[in-house]
């Protein structure tokens, strides 16, 4: 197992100084790829093991199985030359000869090479060696149904026609042997039930993967062969080549594989095409999967490198651009998967001298080119398996690559493991039903997985903001200093100490993504999802949800000898695709316990119980003429869809789902008995992946838009049966648990949604409600087909039911103590909510559900509204922050209009695309649109702008009314009345009206109108000294509050001896600091005026 090297307490390498010294010594004649000795020594501590001797031969032989962990896969088309194919020299000649033997039949007389697809598996050996496995002799194929009257002559003619069709494309003309094989195989289409079962199909194997789509299109147009027709529907022509390989050979994503001893050829060091430790060649049949058990369910010590860059705008205006503006620092944090996160090793590459940083390797340079070249050397020699960071795909990586182009640094483009393939950046977009559509970048860094934490968080969590600061506070309860790019230039040009400050900030931005990966178990969960679904790890990051079900479906079809149509021709159906049932809610605030009955894995269970599948769907009555009515399930609806029952034929989808559910049960048992924490995390990731996978199959069949194999007949049938089961449960509960059957109360189903029903049994005792819930679940489950099962899981008490899919309650699984407050559809967090609304929603729910005090909730709401209208609310609670997107300038939104205003005021500090824009809504003229009244919070403070409290009152009213309207008769009274009649309105010097009005002078003691400040006659005569002392006291209190906030910010930035320059507007302390600073200035002015009056 690879050992983690510990970082020295502090280490500074003055690369720039040493390099300049060397240039002087050698009269500027320094070799192009020269690496300073001190830097070389540092890298050697972290390089992978060496397996070659001095002349480049491997120090081990192929007489043992080679077992490696698969990280990534791709394929390339490579030219294999004639002298290689017939080469008989060398100690491993027989092995290489066996590997290349199949290529001989592809060689033409007039060419000395053949182009073939080679699958590249990037993997990791247990000792830390990275291994490139070049897999030979596997070729792509697809299927078409063979007409009954097709004979050998027709097959020969068909091959000729396919060659002619491919030759129409000039890129294929150079290949003499394009159709490698046509075989007749017995198999069956997945679509629809057929009584005759297996038929003859043609399995057509071709030379290159890109030929498959061309031939698919050709066959879909019907091919005429000797007056006979073939085609129309093509089978398995859409499956990516890599998936085709791993499915055929039962290899799953992120698994251990075995290259059998005596069958692989170890390449000489000089023949390597990659930066991996070593490379092998092997024929596909000698690579086999290893079962996920014992030591082979563990994840090896993957090398994960998290990095972050800092750059400056040379002219000081706007956001840096790679074409002109330099990278001044790159933090690089090396972490070995499975180790404690605090053991990571920190490197910081800086432009110009930087002071030492405890626990970090500081390498500083005199020029940017040398810095970037050294970082490239670092990447190649450290050889990370994963590249991570925060938004590295959309910012850091493109900036580095584009900066390399601007500086003509050709070497910087080679960040991947394949030596001669440059990394390039392409604009791309990602679309799926679950995640929507968003623009991104596509960067080819072969062999290294780009594991961007920003994308992972956005994909898996719904948050108010996705800045690193907000996300870190949400999950790690940590804040970080946010140094705005507009002040980076000053810090960079000041001193080694100021550059240290940038470096400390940059290092933290590299460490936090690793801590998030560790905290949220991203590696474990994604590895297990790849294993469960059989999908390559990288596909989970770059493709939608459907690829996971596609992989499972193809695997099961391969096992049971079915073929899958590439284009599904759906039947005509007028059946409207309805979703799940939602029983009309009986809205209210229920003090008595509400029992919840849940169907366990409802949709997967329906599939299994009723045998719903592509392969069991009846298309033609002719196919079931020999069957009895009891052999068929009819789904009542407009079309009366029909499926054969499992006694006739077991469906593929039910088999897949059944295996996933059973596997999850076994894994959960293993978790109970497992003592090792790492193994527990692996197993927990697996059970989660199994659960998600089982629940994804239904959605796969219902994906009519952009789906890979939609079948609305199956999806409609599932939801129809689900609706009938919810309705049947309601009817059975209410008819059995009633007074006429001897129960104390009549039960009522107050709500039902998708796979659960909420029942009010009438009792006030939580334990009794649980007993009745368990009894109801067992009793009603008997009326459904196995494995459909109704389970009692929880009781809510109290329970607040607002509407369909909107409820909250205290959740009990134990009658003695509630587990948590459970909210569904009640938005306490929305991106357009200010913190005040979020706080009020949470507090009101807490008072209603935990304190069970309606009056307290009402009084709290009124008091907060009064505080708002009298300007006693912390301004930071009113701030809304949004990100400025590329296309936002086309729309009139508050943050967009403000960005335009800020640009007019000062283009140097104005926000750019990608920046966060914070705003408050201020008062305006009558009829002025809201987006025109968005203003910068600091500008509001500086100019005493009047905040539009009515806007915030309306914003509060909408979500709170939804809660209170089901509890009290007149919920509007919360937002009108005595508590709303007193308003404090600030007077601004910035309005048009202020030019014509003279601001009245007020007494700082009693606020009465006076002619001469600071005090009125009454206060001057009776209270002057006490007012003065009170102002002094207020001044000191505000100072203390400011110092406390200042110290908290200094702790966050990791240094108690430097000024706070953080510009993190997602942090509430930022605005509190600004507001208190303003208050201190006002109090200072008042105290001074009182002194002068003496």
From Swiss-Prot:
Keywords, comma-separated and alphabetical: 4Fe-4S, DNA replication, DNA-binding, DNA-directed DNA polymerase, Exonuclease, Hydrolase, Iron, Iron-sulfur, Magnesium, Metal-binding, Nuclease, Nucleotidyltransferase, Nucleus, Transferase, Zinc, Zinc-finger
GO molecular function terms listed in the Swiss-Prot or TrEMBL record: 3'-5'-DNA exonuclease activity; 4 iron, 4 sulfur cluster binding; DNA binding; DNA-directed DNA polymerase activity; nucleotide binding; zinc ion binding
Binding locations of [4Fe-4S] cluster: 1049, 1052, 1062, 1067
Gene Ontology biological process terms in this record: base-excision repair, gap-filling; DNA replication proofreading; nucleotide-excision repair, DNA gap filling
Motif CysB motif, chain ranges: 1049-1067
Membrane-crossing segments per the record: none
Gene Ontology cellular component terms for the protein in this record: delta DNA polymerase complex
Domain of life (superkingdom): Eukaryota
Essential cofactor(s): [4Fe-4S] cluster; Mg(2+)
InterPro entries linked to this entry: DNA-dir_DNA_pol_B, DNA-dir_DNA_pol_B_CS, DNA-dir_DNA_pol_B_exonuc, DNA-dir_DNA_pol_B_multi_dom, DNA/RNA_pol_sf, DNA_pol_B_thumb, DNA_pol_palm_dom_sf, DNA_pol_type-B
Main location: nucleus
Key word Cytoplasm present: no
Annotated binding of Zn(2+), by residue: 1003, 1006, 1016, 1019
Cofactor note: Binds 1 [4Fe-4S] cluster.
Catalytic activity reported: DNA(n) + a 2'-deoxyribonucleoside 5'-triphosphate = DNA(n+1) + diphosphate
Zn finger (CysA-type) location: 1003-1019
Homology family: Belongs to the DNA polymerase type-B family.
Subunit and interaction comment: Heterodimer composed of a catalytic subunit POLD and a small regulatory subunit.
Domain notes for this protein: The CysB motif binds 1 4Fe-4S cluster and is required for the formation of polymerase complexes.
PANTHER family to which the protein is assigned, alphabetical: DNA POLYMERASE CATALYTIC SUBUNIT, DNA POLYMERASE DELTA CATALYTIC SUBUNIT
Identification of the protein by name: DNA polymerase delta catalytic subunit
Organism from which the protein derives: Plasmodium falciparum (isolate K1 / Thailand)
Gene: POLD
């Amino acid at each position: 197992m690879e050992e983690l090297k510990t970082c020295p307490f502090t280490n500074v390498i003055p690369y720039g100084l040493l390099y300049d010294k060397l240039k002087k010594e050698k009269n500027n004649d320094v070799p192009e790829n020269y690496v300073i000795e001190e830097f070389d020594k540092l890298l050697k501590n972290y390089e992978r093991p060496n397996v070659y001797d001095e002349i480049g031969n491997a120090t081990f032989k192929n007489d043992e199985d080679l077992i490696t962990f698969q990280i990534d896969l791709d394929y390339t088309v490579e030219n294999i030359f004639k002298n290689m194919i017939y080469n008989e020299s060398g100690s491993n000649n027989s092995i290489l000869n066996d590997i290349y033997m199949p290529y001989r039949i592809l060689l033409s007389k007039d060419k000395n090479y053949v182009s073939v697809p080679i699958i590249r598996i990037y993997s990791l050996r247990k000792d830390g060696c990275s291994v490139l496995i070049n897999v030979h002799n596997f070729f792509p194929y697809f299927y078409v149904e063979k007409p009954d009257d097709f004979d050998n002559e027709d097959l020969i003619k068909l091959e000729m026609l396919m060659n002619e069709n491919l030759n129409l494309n000039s890129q294929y003309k150079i290949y003499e042997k394009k159709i490698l094989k046509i075989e007749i195989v017995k198999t069956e289409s997945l679509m629809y039930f057929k009584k005759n079962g297996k038929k003859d199909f043609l399995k057509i194997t071709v030379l290159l993967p890109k030929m498959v789509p061309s031939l698919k299109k050709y066959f879909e147009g019907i091919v005429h062969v000797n007056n006979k027709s073939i085609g129309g529907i093509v089978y398995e022509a859409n499956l990516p080549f890599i998936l085709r390989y791993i499915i055929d050979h039962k290899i799953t994503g992120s698994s251990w594989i075995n290259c059998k001893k005596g069958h692989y050829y170890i390449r000489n060091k000089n023949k390597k095409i990659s930066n991996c430790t070593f490379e092998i060649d092997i024929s596909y049949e000698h690579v086999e999967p290893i079962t996920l058990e014992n030591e082979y369910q563990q994840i090896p010590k993957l090398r994960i490198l998290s990095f972050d860059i800092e750059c400056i705008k040379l002219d000081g205006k706007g956001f840096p651009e790679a074409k002109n503006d330099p990278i001044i620092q790159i933090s690089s944090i090396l972490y070995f998967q499975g180790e404690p996160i605090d053991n990571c090793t920190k490197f910081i590459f800086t432009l110009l001298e930087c002071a030492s940083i405890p626990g970090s390797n500081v390498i500083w340079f005199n020029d940017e080119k040398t810095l970037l070249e050294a970082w490239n050397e670092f990447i190649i020699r450290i050889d990370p398996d994963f590249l991570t960071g925060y938004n590295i795909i959309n910012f850091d990586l493109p900036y580095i690559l584009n900066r390399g182009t601007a500086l003509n640094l050709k070497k910087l483009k080679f960040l991947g493991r394949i030596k001669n393939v440059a990394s390039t950046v392409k604009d791309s977009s990602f679309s799926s039903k679950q995640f929507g559509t968003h623009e991104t970048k596509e960067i080819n860094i072969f062999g290294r997985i780009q594991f961007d934490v920003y994308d992972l968080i956005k994909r898996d969590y719904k948050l108010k903001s996705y800045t690193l600061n907000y996300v870190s506070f949400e999950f790690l309860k940590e804040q970080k200093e946010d140094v705005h790019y507009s002040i980076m230039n000053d810090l960079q040009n000041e001193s080694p100490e100021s550059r240290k400050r940038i470096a400390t900030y940059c290092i933290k931005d590299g460490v936090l993504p690793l801590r998030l990966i560790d905290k949220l178990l991203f590696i474990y969960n994604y590895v297990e999802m790849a294993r469960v679904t059989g999908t390559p790890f990288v596909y989970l990051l770059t493709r939608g949800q459907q690829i996971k079900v596609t992989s499972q479906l193809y695997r099961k079809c391969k096992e049971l000898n079915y073929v899958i149509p590439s284009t599904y021709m759906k039947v005509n159906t007028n059946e409207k695709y309805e979703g799940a049932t939602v029983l009309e809610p009986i809205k209210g605030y229920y003090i008595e316990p509400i029992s919840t009955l849940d169907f366990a894995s409802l949709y997967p269970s329906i599939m299994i119980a009723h045998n719903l599948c592509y392969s069991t769907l009846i298309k033609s009555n002719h196919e079931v003429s020999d069957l009895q009515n009891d052999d068929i399930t009819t789904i009542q609806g407009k079309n009366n869809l029909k499926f054969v029952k499992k006694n006739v034929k077991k469906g593929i989808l039910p088999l897949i789902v059944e295996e996933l559910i059973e596997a999850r049960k076994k894994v959960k048992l293993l978790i109970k008995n497992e003592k090792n924490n790492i193994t527990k995390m692996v197993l927990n990731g697996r059970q989660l992946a199994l659960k998600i996978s089982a629940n994804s199959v239904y959605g796969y069949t219902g994906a009519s838009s952009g789906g890979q194999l939609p079948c609305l007949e199956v999806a409609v049938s599932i939801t129809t049966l689900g609706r009938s089961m919810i309705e049947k449960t309601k009817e059975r509960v209410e008819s059995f648990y009633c007074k006429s059957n001897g129960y104390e109360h009549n039960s009522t189903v107050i709500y039902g949604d998708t796979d659960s029903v909420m029942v009010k049994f009438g009792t006030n005792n939580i334990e009794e409600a649980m007993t009745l819930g368990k009894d109801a679940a067992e009793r009603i489950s008997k009326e459904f087909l196995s494995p459909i099962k109704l389970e009692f899981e929880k009781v809510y008490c109290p329970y607040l039911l607002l509407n369909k899919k909107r409820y909250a309650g205290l959740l009990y699984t134990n009658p003695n103590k509630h587990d948590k407050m459970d909210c569904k559809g009640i938005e306490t967090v929305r991106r357009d909510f200010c913190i005040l609304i979020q706080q009020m929603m949470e507090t009101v729910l807490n008072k209603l559900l935990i304190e069970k005090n309606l009056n307290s909730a009402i009084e709290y709401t009124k008091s907060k509204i009064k505080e708002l209208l009298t300007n006693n609310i912390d301004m930071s609670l009113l701030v809304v922050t949004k990100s400025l997107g590329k296309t936002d300038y086309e729309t009139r939104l508050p943050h967009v209009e403000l960005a335009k205003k800020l640009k007019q005021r000062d283009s140097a500090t104005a926000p750019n695309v990608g920046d966060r824009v914070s705003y408050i809504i201020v008062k305006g003229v009558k009829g002025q649109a809201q987006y025109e009244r968005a203003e910068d919070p600091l500008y509001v403070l500086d100019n005493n702008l009047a905040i539009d409290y009515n806007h915030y009152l309306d914003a509060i009213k909408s979500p709170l009314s939804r809660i209170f309207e089901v509890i009290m008769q007149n919920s509007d009274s919360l937002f009108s009345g005595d508590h709303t009649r007193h308003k404090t309105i600030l007077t601004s010097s910035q309005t048009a009206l202020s030019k014509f009005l003279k601001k009245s002078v007020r007494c700082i003691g009693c606020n009465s109108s006076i002619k001469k400040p600071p005090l009125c006659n009454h206060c001057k005569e009776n209270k002057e000294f006490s007012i003065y002392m009170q102002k002094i006291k207020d001044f000191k209190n505000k100072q203390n509050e400011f110092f406390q906030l200042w110290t908290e910010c200094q702790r966050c930035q990791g240094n108690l001896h430097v000024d706070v320059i953080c510009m993190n507007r997602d942090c509430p302390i930022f605005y509190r600091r600004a507001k208190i600073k303003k208050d201190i200035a006002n109090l200072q002015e008042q105290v001074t005026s009182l002194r002068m009056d003496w």
